[in-house]
Amino acid sequence: FNTPAPDLTHSYSYNGRGELAADAMSRGGTYSYVYDNIGNRVTSREGSGASAAAYTANSLNQYTAITREEEAPFAPGYDADGNQTKIQTSTGEWEVSYNALNQAARFIQGNRRVECRYDYLNRRIEKAVYEGEVLMSKKRFIYHGYLQIAELDAADATESAMPVLRKTYLWDPLEPVATRILAMSLFDETGTYVEDLYYTHDLLKNATALFGIRAGRRALYEYGPYGNILRMEGNAAEDNPFRFSSEYADDELGLVYYNYRYYNPQNGRW
């Protein structure tokens, strides 16, 4: 921002099937990928000094082994419906269990667990994070259609105490499908309005920065080609969950929630 030349540039190259083969960045090195004939990754190397990763896929195009240099091989797990029950993300390994509708209901990592509830339209309406039996946070989500328009703190909610409004969101009305987020309003722990923040985006709909009316730039984001965070800074950076592709980032899980399914930037898969 306010520089005569871009601070970061991406130069993309593709193979004969139109798959991303390399992203040469002006800062951070090159991300490179090799695929099999069906489009599964065979190898990847993401950035300068990064270790290479090798992938093994079965006849159902499910990864059955992911091996990174100097790390023990990781073996993803699946249930009979094809849901992935063992995942590896930027925050570590998680065991995932699903409800009868094949919705991810519980994520477990050691003493930590994340529990999710959904409504009849398959929208996630609640996310609770526990350390052992201690509730660390509980968020409830309000939607207009499939666009999240509000987030409430329900950690202390009871029959007599309502959840507290913490965030509201404004979306681009000119793009009803695959839209982008335009603004976020923040509220304090009592539900009192604090401020509005406004988004800038790149051409891929990724949120690149947040600006306040008085305080200037409040957050900055940079991404790898498959959505991993390369740079995130600013005193409002973590307040904003809508980053890559203007979708909701679950920081605890290292996943991105796309309403119908979760995306894992670490291996570029849903």
What are these regions (language model features)?
Residues 142-143, 149-150, 159-166, 214-228:
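Carboxylate/His-rich catalytic cores and anion/metal-binding grooves
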Residues 115-127:
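Transmembrane beta-barrel strand/turn architecture of Gram-negative outer membrane proteins
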Residues 1-6, 10-12, 16, 22-28, ...:
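Beta-turn initiation residues at beta-strand->coil junctions
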Residues 8, 29, 51, 72, ...:
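Exposed loop/turn and edge beta-strand positions of beta-sandwich/beta-sheet ligand-binding modules
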Residues 34-43, 144, 204:
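A surface-exposed, glycine/aromatic-enriched loop/edge motif typical of exported proteins
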Residues 49-58, 64-65, 69, 173, ...:
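A motif-centric feature for acidic-aromatic and gly/ser/thr-rich catalytic loops and repeats
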